[in-house]
Amino acid sequence: MKTKNLNGIYNVVGLNIKKYREANNISQRELSNKLSLYGIDLYHSDISRIESLQLFVRDYELKVICKILNIKLEQLYENTDKFFNF
């Protein structure tokens, strides 16, 4: 499967992942470790690339990230309209 990007961006939720991760005082390495408990193998460098919009993130990864950060999926899409030309 070829991964598409939107004007060089591979996801629109990375900035919010970073915001909520930092609000929960969780490091990228800690998030990576917590994800591995759910069977998701993302290194801390992958988390960094997701947060900088440089790595595609799968829907099931988002669900687990939300569970770890104790947020709803909708919260990851806050203020993401700026990435689209509506």
Regions found by a protein language model. Give the residues of each.
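A short, Lys/Arg-rich alpha-helix, primarily the initiator
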Residues: M1-N24
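Short alpha-helical DNA-recognition segment
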Residues: N25-R49
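DNA major-groove recognition helix of helix-turn-helix/homeodomain DNA-binding modules
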Residues: Q54, R58-Q75
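Helix-turn-helix DNA-binding elements, focusing on the entry/boundary residues of the two helices
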Residues: I17, Q28, H44, D59-L62
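Short, charged recognition helix plus adjacent turn
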Residues: K2-G8, E30, K67, E74-F86
